[in-house]
């Protein structure tokens, strides 16, 4: 955090020709087949659902007119793609009317009709709040789709017949999105600072946030940063550091306000998304990024079409620099060990500005981790009796989380489209389980084990599965890999069939890949045909050491290569 200071007409019934061309163009360039299918099922006429996006834009009056004009074109494009915008103005003692005028111009320039609604909420005599979105539902009928609501942050009090500007915008937005409201599929917060900052990404924005998992930690971290800035304490008692605090006082004040907004944005996202469908998505970015004309670079359009961020959140934050790690390819004759160069991640991509300032959020899924080295009847449900252990001493607490073996097997069977030999598999992993990660109600799962010699073991991703209908959605794969990398930051290995269509995705998340068919030890003819590739993820320190250690590499490769699959009728494949 301190580095930043101390370092220098809307139609839904039949799209016109330009709209069709736009849809085809964008789908051809940004979406996978699954994403295209999901988009078409949700946003075309046949879905029978009118989709809306809710905008909350901070400091719109500070944005250059040229950017506002470009943003107007994006609003028009979103409408063509089936997403009707609605705007809520943030409370401000001086700028509400100015922002209302600017939004009026933006909507008008997009060939739409602004509909100004002064009171977003009505407080009844009983103390209950009622949203204008539910009270004025007639404005959201398909026949009125050209009318774009612009809601001011006022509350009308029925008991006193008066209105007042809200002082609690989080509560205001929470109440606004309750009740029988239109279907809101996206919640966009635009500002000048961008998404929620991440220390792991050099204070650039988090790529993806699973609120169910990360809200408490992130809100605590932001609150701590605010507290630190408020104290105005120097980095040390050194005279220069004390002078820095005085000289940079305006920047510190500005950053403090910025972090207050970040915390408020996070809480806004949590409250609003809690009131919407589980599939709803939140996105925080800058107005400048939201105004980009390129469909590949614009985070709003890209998220509408794919329901994900511009880049994946589970991509490694480090890669080897050229010449930093000696390539071990020459150790194994002409068989190559592939390493991703540093520019794949660290160099600015073509859409770098938007990537670095955009955070995508989901209310998300609950996550459970089972750190049991051995599965027993006391920490699991449905475990075959042959794996039961004698009860010794005090009986384990019945409140401790238990792994559901039936669901465990079911998700693996469905994901891999083959039947797991449960007895054989548990026999193989029991006693050396590193962790088991379960997403939601067994919608995603990862089983990690310790492999290799006991004195020099390594973490191995033995099974990674997502229910077929959820692959590519909710960021489940990214959530699992992020958890793995955080839990085991030094190194993780996994293998995949050579013809696996997911290998490109795996390749992007590894720092090295090896064909397991190579001769591991030419002197002793240790060569076997294998249908697998080995993927290696490691931080720079571990990777540098491992990739130079021929003995360690052979241990990796031999251990992973010789693991026998535990599928029924498929025991002899290697």
Swiss-Prot record:
Subcellular location: Mitochondrion
Gene3D superfamilies per record: 3.40.630.30
Entry GO MF terms: L-glutamate N-acetyltransferase activity
Keyword set includes Chaperone: no
pH dependence: Optimum pH is 8.5-9.5.
Catalytic reactions on record: L-glutamate + acetyl-CoA = N-acetyl-L-glutamate + CoA + H(+)
EC number(s) reported in the record: 2.3.1.1
Record's keyword terms, sorted: Acyltransferase, Amino-acid biosynthesis, Mitochondrion, Transferase, Transit peptide
Pathway terms, separated by semicolons: Amino-acid biosynthesis; L-arginine biosynthesis; N(2)-acetyl-L-ornithine from L-glutamate: step 1/4
Domain of life: Eukaryota
Annotated InterPro entries: GlcNAc_Synth_fun (IPR011190), Vertebrate-like_GNAT_dom (IPR006855)
Limits of the N-acetyltransferase domain: 392-560
Regulation: Feedback inhibition by L-arginine.
Note: Present with 112 molecules/cell in log phase SD medium.
Reported function: N-acetylglutamate synthase involved in arginine biosynthesis.
Subunit architecture: Interacts with the acetylglutamate kinase chain of AGR5,6.
Descriptive protein name: Amino-acid acetyltransferase, mitochondrial
Gene: ARG2
């Amino acid at each position: 955090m301190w580095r930043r200071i101390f370092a220098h007409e809307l139609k839904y019934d039949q799209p016109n020709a330009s709209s069709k061309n736009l849809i085809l163009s964008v789908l051809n360039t940004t979406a996978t087949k699954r994403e295209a299918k999901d988009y078409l099922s949700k946003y075309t006429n046949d879905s029978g659902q009118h989709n809306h996006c809710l905008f909350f834009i901070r400091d719109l009056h500070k944005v250059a007119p040229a950017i506002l004009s470009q943003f107007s074109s994006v609003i028009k494009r979103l409408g063509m793609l089936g997403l009707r915008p609605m705007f809520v103005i943030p409370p401000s003692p001086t700028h509400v009317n100015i922002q209302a005028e600017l939004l009026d111009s933006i909507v008008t320039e997009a060939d739409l009709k602004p509909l100004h609604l002064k009171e977003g909420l009505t407080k009844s005599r009983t103390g209950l709040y009622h949203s204008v979105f539910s009270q004025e539902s007639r404005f959201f009928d398909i026949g009125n789709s050209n009318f774009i609501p612009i809601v001011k942050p006022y509350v009308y009090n029925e008991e006193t017949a008066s209105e007042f500007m809200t002082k609690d915008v989080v509560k205001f937005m929470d109440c606004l999105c309750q009740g029988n409201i239109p279907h809101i599929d996206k919640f966009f917060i635009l500002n000048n600072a961008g998404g929620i900052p991440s220390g792991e990404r050099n204070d650039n924005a988090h790529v993806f946030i699973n609120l169910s998992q990360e809200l408490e930690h992130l809100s605590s971290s932001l609150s701590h940063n605010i507290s630190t800035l408020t104290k105005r304490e120097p980095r040390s008692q050194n005279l220069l550091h004390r002078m820095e605090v005085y000289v940079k006082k305006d920047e510190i004040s500005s950053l403090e306000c910025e972090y207050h907004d970040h915390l408020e944005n996070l809480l806004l996202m949590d409250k609003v998304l809690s009131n919407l469908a589980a599939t709803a998505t939140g996105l925080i970015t800058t107005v400048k990024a939201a105004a980009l004309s390129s469909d590949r670079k614009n985070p709003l359009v890209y998220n509408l079409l794919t329901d994900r961020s511009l880049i994946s959140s589970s991509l490694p934050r480090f890669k080897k620099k050229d010449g930093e790690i000696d390539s071990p390819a020459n150790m194994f004759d002409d068989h190559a060990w592939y390493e991703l160069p540093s520019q794949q991640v660290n160099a600015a991509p073509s859409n770098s500005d938007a990537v670095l300032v955009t955070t995508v959020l989901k209310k998300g899924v609950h996550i459970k981790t089972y750190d049991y080295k051995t599965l027993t009847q006391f920490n699991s449900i449905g475990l075959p009796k042959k794996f039961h252990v004698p009860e010794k001493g005090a009986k384990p607490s019945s409140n401790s989380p238990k792994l559901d073996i039936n669901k465990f097997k079911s998700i693996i069977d469905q994901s891999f489209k083959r039947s797991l030999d449960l007895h054989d598999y548990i026999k193989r992993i029991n006693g050396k389980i590193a962790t088991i990660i379960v997403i939601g109600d067994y919608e995603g799962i990862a089983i990690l084990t310790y492999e290799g010699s006991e004195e020099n073991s390594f973490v191995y991703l033995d099974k990674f599965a997502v229910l077929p209908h959820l692959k590519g959605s909710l960021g489940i794969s990214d959530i699992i890999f992020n958890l793995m990398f955080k839990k085991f930051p030094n190194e993780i290995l996994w293998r995949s069939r050579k013809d696996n269509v997911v290998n490109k995705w795996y390749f992007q998340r590894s720092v090295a890949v090896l064909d397991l068919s190579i001769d591991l030890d030419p002197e002793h003819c240790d060569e076997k045909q294998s249908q697998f590739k080995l993927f290696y993820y490691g931080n720079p320190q571990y990777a540098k050491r491992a990739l130079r250690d021929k003995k360690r590499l052979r241990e990796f490769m031999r251990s992973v290569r010789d693991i026998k699959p535990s599928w029924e009728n498929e025991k002899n494949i290697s």
